[in-house]
Swiss-Prot record:
<comment type="similarity">
    <text>Belongs to the TRAFAC class translation factor GTPase superfamily. Classic translation factor GTPase family. EF-G/EF-2 subfamily.</text>
</comment>
<dbReference type="InterPro" id="IPR009000">
    <property type="entry name" value="Transl_B-barrel_sf"/>
</dbReference>
<dbReference type="InterPro" id="IPR004540">
    <property type="entry name" value="Transl_elong_EFG/EF2"/>
</dbReference>
<dbReference type="GO" id="GO:0097216">
    <property type="term" value="F:guanosine tetraphosphate binding"/>
</dbReference>
<keyword id="KW-0342">GTP-binding</keyword>
<feature type="binding site">
    <location>
        <begin position="132"/>
        <end position="135"/>
    </location>
    <ligand>
        <name>GTP</name>
    </ligand>
</feature>
<dbReference type="Pfam" id="PF03764">
    <property type="entry name" value="EFG_IV"/>
</dbReference>
<dbReference type="GO" id="GO:0032790">
    <property type="term" value="P:ribosome disassembly"/>
</dbReference>
<keyword id="KW-0963">Cytoplasm</keyword>
<dbReference type="Pfam" id="PF14492">
    <property type="entry name" value="EFG_III"/>
</dbReference>
<keyword id="KW-0648">Protein biosynthesis</keyword>
<protein>
    <recommendedName>
        <fullName>Elongation factor G</fullName>
    </recommendedName>
</protein>
<dbReference type="InterPro" id="IPR035647">
    <property type="entry name" value="EFG_III/V"/>
</dbReference>
<dbReference type="InterPro" id="IPR014721">
    <property type="entry name" value="Ribsml_uS5_D2-typ_fold_subgr"/>
</dbReference>
<dbReference type="InterPro" id="IPR027417">
    <property type="entry name" value="P-loop_NTPase"/>
</dbReference>
<dbReference type="InterPro" id="IPR031157">
    <property type="entry name" value="G_TR_CS"/>
</dbReference>
<dbReference type="InterPro" id="IPR035649">
    <property type="entry name" value="EFG_V"/>
</dbReference>
């Protein structure tokens, strides 16, 4: 068995275009995994192996790659930076122990960086920071460090300083050994020399080294006291303190360089080994109750002596077949073992196991706690399922994914391709939990739901290229919701008599608005036996089932509380089905009286605008019913944060490029549901009626 202290499971994440795929490429070249480095702008990079990724120059799926550095095994996940694929980042963070946050030296802390950083904080993932692209025009390492402090409220621990900047960038000062690392112009990462620090940088290097040591020794009281008494700590003591502070998220070791020019990557790799945690040094995964989802108090201890426990964190269908990516938390998995899927209750025999290198693979006969690998040909497994030893059934903490906010209706251009389309869409749904499909019961249309326009564009593209299914795509539809604003006290009786035994159920109830995000809540305060307890579940089921279709436009209903306080029953004619029908009738009767209201999804929008165009951009956001939350001037322009209804954001990127002469950028993610203005609600209701009439 491998020594777990020599394992590092890390993710590389950042804003789109910050250079994380290029950084991964350089790491793979340095660790001997690839011989010729692919360039993203040539569509050749190793981890961007889907056609859509190679074409668009953005990473969509998190490719898992295993490589080695200084006798340590690194499992690297290269995550997407585009906001529509945030679910991939979240999914990856769930199975990682550490990460490298890549920031652009000129762009700084960009919108998606914030989202990824927030997710990483929530997941408790220790990170190093790599400020990339210091060879770029407008690059400023110190400005980016300041942004990390201000925008992310994080504590960057500067470990290297740039020597030169933009075209003059040639190397870094390593503050640990107080030496300069200078690369030549051949572009080869191994062609560098270690020399004395340039004279004009000695003072700054001493200043930053002092800050580094002062911050590090705060992790050890004895060392801090000795340092305050004038005793310089040893290099090993400094590293030990940095390691502890990094693992505790007290600070983030921060490096600089240029991945494209092959400068500075070695020191980042050393930091992964020296400062990021091994699988045994992170909090073990909690086990949860299968029924309630609540923690049981037990954990999956990272050890090869424990029973086998693993999490399926990604499903992929590629040219080799169906792949299930798993992270093993405890125990050992051998080829031929039988394992239990605790979510389905079914067992499966492990056929082939492979170690992935982007889309190439190495066959394995066994794997152990700490490993990230892919199993070939598993059936009935979905993202978030727990795989375990059949004799020691358990459930790991599940993954929770955001609900889609946008949908499109699709149908195959070839009328005979319906079955082919259904199979292909089924595979995509298994791969991506934030992508959903449903069939419109009235029209029979297939509805695809996703996290944004680009998300759905790419799915349609994959269906065409990978599965040969060309689709006719309808206009994007917003996922509106409905709710109520007034309390109602009411009564409903369901009575049916048509020979033989009849049906009878009477309910007296109160309906009122619930708390935001509370969903549907049912309570009973019936005193005595007017409604026997055995009928309560049927009444709850009747009300809950009606929450799927609201009274105004047929959208799902949010945040409603129902209290059953009295009723009546018949000894012969009352039954569960009679009370369920009564609850459905009660819902239809009372909802129009309860002040029903249309809710619309509001997006958190982050726009970058050149200074010259800020007024136009803000004016445009206001016209889109946007609420400006914040503005921040940077070196290259202004960032504007706003809440804007999703319905106003379709096609926004084209409009933004027009008013900023192609220089504007934006990202958005779902924020909350909010009541529509009456004129918008009226339009939504009219459109819903028109769709219904057309079916």
């Amino acid at each position: 068995m491998s020594d777990l202290s020599h394992y590092r499971n890390i993710g590389i994440f950042a804003h789109v275009d910050a250079g994380k795929t290029t950084t991964t490429e350089r790491i793979l070249k340095l660790t001997g995994k690839i011989h010729k480095t692919g360039e993203v702008h040539d569509g050749e990079s190793t981890t961007d192996f889907m056609e859509q990724e190679a074409e668009r120059g953005i990473t969509i799926q998190s490719a898992a790659t295993t490589c080695f550095w200084k006798d340590h095994r690194m499992n690297i996940i290269d995550t997407p930076g585009h906001v529509d694929f945030t679910v991939e980042v979240y999914r990856s963070l769930k199975v990682l122990d550490g990460g490298i946050g890549v920031f652009c030296g000129s762009g700084g802390v960009e919108p998606q960086s914030e989202t990824n950083w927030r997710y990483a904080n929530e997941s408790g993932v220790a990170r190093c920071i790599f400020v990339n692209k210091l060879d770029r025009m407008g690059a400023d390492f110190y400005r980016v460090v300041g942004q990390v402090k201000k925008v992310l409220a994080a504590n960057p621990l500067v470990m290297t300083l740039p020597i030169g900047i933009e075209d003059e960038f040639k190397g870094v000062v390593n503050l640990l050994d107080m030496k300069a690392y200078i690369w030549d112009d051949t572009g080869l990462p191994e062609n560098y020399e270690v020399v004395d620090i340039p004279e004009d940088m000695v003072e700054k290097a001493n200043e930053y080294r002092e800050q580094l040591i002062e911050t590090a020794v705060e992790q050890d009281d004895d060392l801090m006291m000795a340092y305050m008494d004038g005793e310089e700590p040893s290099l090993e003591d400094i590293k030990r303190c940095i390691r502890k502070g990094t693992r505790d998220l007290a600070f983030f070791p921060t490096y600089c360089g240029s991945a494209f020019k092959n400068k500075g990557i070695q020191l980042v790799l050393d930091a992964v080994i020296d400062f990021l945690p091994s699988p045994t040094e992170v909090d073990p995964q909690p086990l949860t109750d299968e029924e309630t989802g609540e923690p049981t108090g037990e954990v999956a201890t990272v050890s090869t002596d424990e029973p086998f426990r693993a999490l399926a964190f990604k499903i992929m269908d590629d040219r080799f077949g169906a792949l299930t990516f798993i992270r093993i938390y405890s125990g050992v998995l051998n080829k031929g073992d039988t394992i239990l899927n605790s979510a389905t209750g079914k067992t499966e025999r492990i056929g082939r196991m492979v170690e992935m290198h982007a889309d190439e693979r190495t066959e394995l006969t066994s794997a152990q706690a700490g490993d990230i690998l892919a199993v070939v040909g598993m059936k009935n497994v979905q993202t978030g399922h727990t795989l375990c030893d059949p004799k020691n059934a358990c459930t790991l903490e599940p993954m929770i994914f955001p609900e889609p906010v946008i949908s499109i209706a699709v149908k195959p251009k070839d009328k005979g391709a319906n079955e082919k389309m259904s199979i292909a869409i089924g595979k995509l749904v298994a791969e991506d939990p934030s992508f959903q499909v449903e069939t419109d019961e009235d029209s029979g249309e297939t509805i695809l739901k996703g996290m944004g326009e680009l998300h759905l564009d790419i799915k349609v593209d994959i269906l065409k290229r990978t599965y040969g299914v060309e689709l006719e795509v309808g206009q994007p539809q917003v996922a509106y919701r409905e709710t109520i604003t007034l309390p109602v006290e009411d009564s409903y009786t369901h009575k049916k008599q048509s020979g033989g035994s009849g049906q009878f159920g009477k309910i007296d109830y109160r309906i009122k608005p619930g708390e935001t995000n509370s969903g549907f809540k049912f309570t009973s305060t019936v005193v005595g036996g007017n409604v026997p307890k055995e009928f309560f579940p049927a009444i709850e089921k009747g009300f809950a089932g009606m929450m799927e279709v609201g009274p105004l436009a047929g959208y799902p209903v949010l945040d409603v509380e129902v209290e059953l306080y009295d009723g009546g029953f018949h000894a012969v004619d009352s039954s569960a089905i009679a009370f369920e029908i009564a609850a459905k009738g009660a819902f239809r009767q009372s909802m129009p009286k309860a002040g029903p209201q249309i809710l619309e999804p509001v997006m958190k929008v982050d726009v970058f605008s050149p200074e010259d165009n800020v007024g136009d951009v803000i004016g445009d956001l206001n016209r889109r019913r946007g609420m400006i939350k914040d503005q921040e001037a940077g070196a290259t322009g202004v960032r504007i944060k706003a809440d804007v209804p999703l319905s106003e954001m379709f096609g926004y990127i084209g409009h933004l490029r027009t008013i900023t002469s192609g220089r504007g950028q934006f990202s958005m993610e779902f924020s909350h549901y909010s009541a529509c203005p009456q004129n918008v609600a009226d339009k939504v209701i009219e459109e819903a009626k028109a769709r219904k009439a057309a079916k």
